[in-house]
Design a protein with these regions (language model features):
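Membrane-interface "cap" regions at the ends of multi-pass membrane proteins
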Residues: 1-39, 52-53, 57, 69, ...
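Hydrophobic transmembrane alpha-helices that form the core helical bundles
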Residues: 32-35, 44, 54-129, 133-137, ...
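TM-loop-TM module centered on a large, flexible mid-protein loop between adjacent transmembrane helices
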Residues: 71-81, 112-114, 225-288, 307-344, ...
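Hydrophobic alpha-helical segments of multi-pass membrane transport proteins
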Residues: 157-161, 348-375, 394-399, 418-440
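C-terminal membrane-solvent junction of multi-pass transporters and transport-like membrane proteins
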Residues: 310-321, 356-412
Length: 464
């Protein structure tokens, strides 16, 4: 049911989107990026915001043509064939692997706050993941309030990090490569850092596209909001990168989370605030939010037939315990097997980027298929430029996938390939079994296209 009341304007979308984009990734991955590129990490994260915007080009292109009230689900349904629908559905489950990265990062920060936990990080991560999954049983209202509070604390922590750290950076040498600290790994290292930091820089489109149903003039507001969010995030992350890479020597920050730099720049009280309120709070909030947001996509996967019918089961309150239990098992697998945080991120990002390649290239067909909507697009650009952006978007997604893959260990690379193969095999298998019927998917696609066209026409009439 569509929400009633005052609709969101541009600044509402910017606020929501920026809050959603600034998340856990920058806390836990900045040190891995520094390991590849040294002090040029500031350029990596600033450029990375625009690079990842291109990698998610379809999230900017499609909302400029249509009012997509179903967000990401509607966009993918509109462009996917039956096989890719299955791959995307199974990918929803595989994304559970990424949930473990939050728990691993949380354990790292807890070990900083409570040093006696240093040798028990795997146990802490396992217990944390279990408790967070149990918390989903009680619903999301309290968690949503908590997330809003923690977001304010997070923004305050990052602002303090930049404010206290920027004065301790030696700008005379920060952007110099004389000591090998700037562009530490050369161009290859820069691109590898760009790929690793993609996880932290990819969130600029997620929140805005999910809000189309409650946004005023969404065809204009959402694309414009995404562009502004990306610019602001590039400035914030760039400033953080200057501090994280420029205060301490490379050897002390490479591969470490930013609490190492925070300890060097903050008084003890503010350092504790940064670790607990910023690090632990942000990670916990992100994990709770991610688990809550997965409820309906997971149910959709089960209800569409991609999973056996047992996974449709819910308790008397509607809690989908069967599918959440499966998701939990997937989420704790990297923890109990001891996979590294950067490997976990890579193994989820690689198939995600492969799906993005498909989506970005599929956008090439939209102007011809929907000439009326193309003529009324909110981002006025010539067709040749739009086509270049589609191809560039696929290229950027491919660059991220390739660079993440090449930097994996042999065992992690095999696991990443296995994930992609299993996604494809399960999609084909369920279609051949008739558990999911291609004609049903086609009907759903037609309905979503009709609804998108109708909503777009209604929005244009209202705006006129």
């Amino acid at each position: 049911m569509e929400e009633k009341g005052k609709k969101l304007g541009l600044w509402n979308i910017i606020g929501l989107g920026l809050g959603g984009a600034i998340g856990t990734g920058i806390f836990v991955l900045l040190g891995y990026g520094i390991a590849y590129t040294g002090r040029s990490i500031s350029l990596v994260v600033a450029v990375g915001c625009f690079f990842m915007l291109l990698a998610y080009w379809y999230n900017l292109a499609m909302p400029s043509l249509f009012v997509m009230k179903g967000g990401d689900y509607s966009m993918k349904t509109m462009l996917f064939n039956p096989f890719m629908s299955g791959v995307s559905a199974w990918m929803t489950l595989v994304s559970g692997l990424a949930m473990s990265s939050y728990a691993v990062a949380l354990a790292q920060y807890l070990a900083i706050a409570v040093p006696s936990l240093q040798n028990y990080q795997t146990v802490v991560a396992f217990v944390a993941m279990t408790l967070f999954f149990l918390s989903t049983i009680k619903g999301s209202r309290f968690l949503t309030i908590l997330e809003n509070i923690v977001t304010l604390v997070l923004v305050a922590a990052l602002a303090l990090f930049v404010a206290f750290g920027i004065g301790k950076v030696d700008f005379a040498s920060t952007f110099s490569s004389a000591d090998g600290g700037f562009f530490h790994g050369g161009f290859t290292g820069f691109v590898s850092a760009l790929a690793v930091m993609g996880w932290a820089c990819q969130g600029t489109t997620m929140a805005p596209i999910s809000m189309a149903a409650v946004t005023k003039n969404p065809k204009r507001t959402i694309p414009l909001g995404i562009i502004v969010i990306t610019c602001l995030l590039a400035v914030v992350y760039g400033a953080m990168g200057i501090v994280a890479g420029g205060v301490l020597p490379y050897a002390e920050t490479a591969g470490q989370n930013i609490s190492v730099t925070a300890q060097a720049i903050f008084p003890n009280a503010l350092y504790i605030f940064f670790v607990v309120g910023g690090g632990i709070g942000a990670i916990a909030s992100s994990l709770l939010g991610a688990l809550g947001m997965m409820r309906y996509p997971l149910l959709q996967v089960a209800n569409d037939g991609w999973l056996p019918s047992v996974f449709k089961k819910t308790d008397k309150n509607g809690y989908p315990y069967a599918i959440y239990l499966l998701f939990y098992v997937i989420s704790i697998y990297p923890i109990v097997t001891g996979r590294s945080l950067d490997a976990i991120v890579s193994q989820v990002m690689i198939p995600t980027m492969l799906i993005n390649i498909y989506m970005n290239l599929a956008c090439l067909t939209l102007p011809k298929k929907y000439p009326e909507q193309w003529a009324q697009r909110s981002i006025k650009m010539p067709l040749w430029f739009y086509n270049i952006c589609c191809v560039l978007g696929a290229f950027c997604a491919g660059v991220v996938a390739y660079n993440l893959f090449k930097d994996l260990t042999f065992n992690d690379a095999v696991f990443a390939v296995a994930i992609v193969v299993v996604l494809c095999v399960l999609s084909i298998l369920r279609l051949k079994q008739g558990a999911v019927k291609a004609e049903d998917l086609a009907s759903k696609k037609e309905e979503i296209v009709r609804q998108a066209i109708a909503d777009t026409a209604a929005d244009e009439t209202e705006a006129a």
